[in-house]
Amino acid sequence: MGSNLSPQLCLMPFILGLLSGGVTTTPWSLARPQGSCSLEGVEIKGGSFRLLQEGQALEYVCPSGFYPYPVQTRTCRSTGSWSTLKTQDQKTVRKAECRAIHCPRPHDFENGEYWPRSPYYNVSDEISFHCYDGYTLRGSANRTCQVNGRWSGQTAICDNGAGYCSNPGIPIGTRKVGSQYRLEDSVTYHCSRGLTLRGSQRRTCQEGGSWSGTEPSCQDSFMYDTPQEVAEAFLSSLTETIEGVDAEDGHGPGEQQKRKIVLDPSGSMNIYLVLDGSDSIGASNFTGAKKCLVNLIEKVASYGVKPRYGLVTYATYPKIWVKVSEADSSNADWVTKQLNEINYEDHKLKSGTNTKKALQAVYSMMSWPDDVPPEGWNRTRHVIILMTDGLHNMGGDPITVIDEIRDLLYIGKDRKNPREDYLDVYVFGVGPLVNQVNINALASKKDNEQHVFKVKDMENLEDVFYQMIDESQSLSLCGMVWEHRKGTDYHKQPWQAKISVIRPSKGHESCMGAVVSEYFVLTAAHCFTVDDKEHSIKVSVGGEKRDLEIEVVLFHPNYNINGKKEAGIPEFYDYDVALIKLKNKLKYGQTIRPICLPCTEGTTRALRLPPTTTCQQQKEELLPAQDIKALFVSEEEKKLTRKEVYIKNGDKKGSCERDAQYAPGYDKVKDISEVVTPRFLCTGGVSPYADPNTCRGDSGGPLIVHKRSRFIQVGVISWGVVDVCKNQKRQKQVPAHARDFHINLFQVLPWLKEKLQDEDLGFL
């Protein structure tokens, strides 16, 4: 705290049907299935197992780099015995074991050679391809066997360009029948016994030189897509879908153009989110799925597009929560709110798995009354995202509904204008019980795009959507964080800066600050004295141990801590703000990002307000005349933690400010406005809730409003009435008059705008 006072020197249509298996991990020695199968003799050599579906199935688990042989899962049969251990060629095995993962070998490679040749390849082994004279290599010349049993890179293809279509290649592990690539010629692909084909089994050479469908691959049961692979492939395809060429943009029918991220306001997209709430899911997986969808909505919104959403949950029967026809269905915040309010128990009484009914609910929202298409129906794009293990247990085959949707949207009927761009079906297989044949049948198959994915578990799926959001293009966006379970303190508070001022013979002073641009950190002026030299000021960001070089500290010209000493006020904190200018430009990353400042274009976008929004309108949005939920970031036991407080900006504002009289040195102040000027925001006290207080070392840190998943700084921590952190420990019991005061950034905007005018923040 300060000298006598307490300045605190001291944060498309999409479908989601999740059928992930409801996994419960249990030590096998203690577990007992709720079914009738004994656990005796089911253990696996070199690994362990866990029970699924309340003991009706089990999954074998092996260390990284190994896979369960001969099967990954077993089911409890009605006879009271576990399903037999059988190899891919149907031979019975007595005991399961963990075997080293190998990558498949190329069965065929046309018009070239590969080296080394081997019946199988171990993890980290490399293979190289080269072409015969007259042929050109496409794809990856060198590939590495990865820990998930897949080869890195892209399919190597040797082509001489003689065909109407280019050579479609032979993905490693597949066999191809057909070597003519003329218009309307077809090729077919096959997998070895025991492997499942993903992608298109048959591909046809089409007008324009492209192949129908998507590149196939052969999958073993232990193979999974990594979160990074899924995020890259899905996001690549998704951004292709977010806008396409419509029928009125001057391009001829069937003409393929690169689709853009920015959606034409006159265009149309519907996004249907459909979650499976059946018994096989489990509450934790259902909650995880909702988190994924929230992140997906955020991702789409970050592109500045406003599709219409539909929201459906289902088990035996579907339940429609949001219809695309509703007025608010394009409001991402409103849709997110509806999504967060859904409970897993909503389908508890009828908990079958009727994927077909869920898709029919989507079909009903796509269709139009009296079978009369509305104007512009053929410019609406549709995307379906289905998360499932493919094991629907009632209602019939859901693929028939996909066919009906294609028919409704007039897709694939006109060879010259097949309209394939207007429907994308993404299928995520989640968990060990995935039926790869079924999920592949449901997914779209498009050239150079991937629409079917298999992820290991819900944890991996959440990784996918976090990676989608946190791509490099968004690093400069203000107020964004990486709210991931694996994230560090600085992933979650990437703007937070630690400041230390070393004063010879006087020790050192600690403060906080916030990164507001690539060259500036915003903090409190009282953290420094006029005698402090730049070399004595240490600033660190992103949790890095190295200190940043300081060019200059800029004080607000109206700040003067001794300005009212003659009036008997020992310390005066009006205009208590300063900017630290760094010598070198910060490099933004996941742990170093700027916070949003009021009255900037970045905050307008963060709040999803119209581009014409004024500074006053931002103020009304962020600081309405009421109690405002906010937060600050404090360091406790070397960890950054968020503390939730309420800014008293309504009927409690006066009493909050009057409690300043309890601060040391202010007890004789007759008019509290002498020390609490209009530049201050007040937090603390016990109403409407007991607010935590700032500590010595928190000074200069940001007071933050968290809205629409973005963080906007509205204040700078300045001073407090009570020192609640004596002896380096935060007191649990504090008086009701323990208040904290923060400089309101809306009140110092002219100064901020002047000093940050070259930082490309777009002040309004």
From Swiss-Prot:
Positions that bind Mg(2+): 278, 280, 353
InterPro entries according to UniProt: Compl_C2_B (IPR011360), Complement_B (IPR028341), Peptidase_S1_PA (IPR009003), Peptidase_S1A (IPR001314), Sushi/SCR/CCP_sf (IPR035976), Sushi_SCR_CCP_dom (IPR000436), Trypsin_dom (IPR001254), TRYPSIN_HIS (IPR018114)
Residue pairs linked by disulfide bridges in the UniProt entry: 37-76, 62-98, 103-145, 131-158, 165-205, 191-218, 478-596, 511-527, 599-615, 656-682, 695-725
Post-translational modification: Cleaved by CFD following activation of the alternative complement system, generating Ba and Bb chains. Cleavage and activation takes place when CFB is already associated with complement C3b.
Domain Sushi: 35-100, 101-160, 163-220
Residues bound to Mn(2+): 278, 280, 353
Top EC class, one word: hydrolase
Hydrolase found in the keyword field: yes
UniProt-listed Gene3D superfamilies: 2.40.10.120, Complement Module, domain 1 (2.10.70.10), von Willebrand factor, type A domain (3.40.50.410)
Medical condition linked: Macular degeneration, age-related, 14: A form of age-related macular degeneration, a multifactorial eye disease and the most common cause of irreversible vision loss in the developed world. In most patients, the disease is manifest as ophthalmoscopically visible yellowish accumulations of protein and lipid that lie beneath the retinal pigment epithelium and within an elastin-containing structure known as Bruch membrane. Hemolytic uremic syndrome, atypical, 4: An atypical form of hemolytic uremic syndrome. It is a complex genetic disease characterized by microangiopathic hemolytic anemia, thrombocytopenia, renal failure and absence of episodes of enterocolitis and diarrhea. In contrast to typical hemolytic uremic syndrome, atypical forms have a poorer prognosis, with higher death rates and frequent progression to end-stage renal disease.
UniProt comment concerning the protein's domains: The unliganded VWA domain has an inactive 'locked' conformation whereby the scissile Arg-259|Lys-260 bond is protected from proteolytic activation.
Protein name: Complement factor B
